Curated annotation (Swiss-Prot):
PROSITE patterns: 4FE4S_FER_1, 4FE4S_FER_2
Disulfide bonds: none
A Pfam entry, by short name: Fer4_5
Protein's recorded name: Uncharacterized protein MJ0749
Keyword annotations: 4Fe-4S, Cell membrane, Electron transport, Iron, Iron-sulfur, Membrane, Metal-binding, Repeat, Transmembrane, Transmembrane helix, Transport
Organism of provenance: Methanocaldococcus jannaschii (strain ATCC 43067 / DSM 2661 / JAL-1 / JCM 10045 / NBRC 100440)
Location of this chain's protein in the cell: Cell membrane
Record: residues binding [4Fe-4S] cluster 1: 194, 197, 200, 229
MF-aspect GO terms: 4 iron, 4 sulfur cluster binding; metal ion binding; oxidoreductase activity
Entry GO CC: plasma membrane
Length: 246
């Protein structure tokens, strides 16, 4: 008996396009709802510093505690779903890079030089350590001006390079990446179906080399790659490995 468990796998292209469109709509709805919720919970004060502090260090607001537990459990099960579906800042950074794609009619998302990118992705772990150290040593960072300056800076950087903050800086993303490393459901590539067109890589906002090695720790489960793969070579599944070329 085939013990593999699939949640998203397709052989029929028409069915796949339909389903992926629905998943993208669902993702947009989820992102919007969580964004509105964040606005209400914070009294319209969207502070990156506050967000990091609440998530990494914690606070006593029940809604935050529940969101944090959900994000970590989801990371264990399916990876960084929080980043792609729930994070209010992820939503904003998603919007700005999509705006750039629309304005400049881009066919391929802008990329950072490969060597620099491969080093920069580790910077967010340094930020995570710094945040914990700052907390332990009693350093307090706050202020409206700083919050909005940081948001503006990362929105501009996110306009130039998709999800810049999420890729390189966010300590919440780095914390969830650690759990995502062991996630049950993973994004997989079937090398027998892949024709090497790299359409998926052109659309990946996290600049993952999907056709070489899918970095599950970096993947934010946006499923943009699956939406553009015309060969159905990508699947999101549990208990399976990448299918090697026969
Ligand atoms: S879009 Fe599909 S077929 Fe093309 S490179 Fe990516 S996985 Fe392979
Ligand atoms: S690999 Fe696919 S699901 Fe993961 S971040 Fe890139 S486009 Fe999104």
């Amino acid at each position: 008996m085939d013990s593999r468990v699939y949640i998203i796998k397709f052989d029929n292209w028409g069915f796949m396009v339909n389903l992926m469109n629905k998943i993208q709509i669902l993702r947009k709805i989820s992102q919007t709802l969580f964004f509105v919720r964040a606005l209400i919970v914070t009294g319209f004060y969207l502070s990156i510093v506050g967000f990091i502090k609440r998530f990494i260090i914690g606070d006593r607001i029940l809604a935050t505690i529940i969101t944090k537990i959900i994000a970590i459990v989801l990371a264990f099960i399916a990876g960084r779903v929080f980043c792609g579906w729930m994070c209010p800042f992820g939503f904003l950074f998603n919007l700005v890079y999509e705006l750039r794609v629309k304005l400049f009619k881009l066919k391929k998302l802008p990329t950072v030089d490969e060597k620099i990118h491969n080093k920069l992705i580790y910077f967010k772990y340094v930020v995570l350590i710094l945040v914990v150290l700052a907390y332990l040593s009693g350093v307090k960072i706050s202020g409206y001006t700083l919050a909005y300056l940081l948001l503006a800076l990362f929105l501009v950087l996110g306009f130039i390079y998709p999800m810049f903050f999420c890729r390189y800086v966010c300590p919440v993303g780095s914390l969830l990446s650690i759990f995502a490393r062991f996630s049950i459901f993973k994004l997989k590539l079937d090398e027998n179906k892949c024709v090497g067109c790299r359409l998926c890589e052109r659309k990946c906002p996290m600049q993952i080399k999907i056709t070489e090695k899918i970095d599950q720790m970096e993947c934010i489960r946006c499923f943009e790659c699956m939406s553009v793969c015309k060969k159905g070579a990508l699947s999101f599944s549990a208990f399976t490995k990448n299918t090697k070329k026969e």
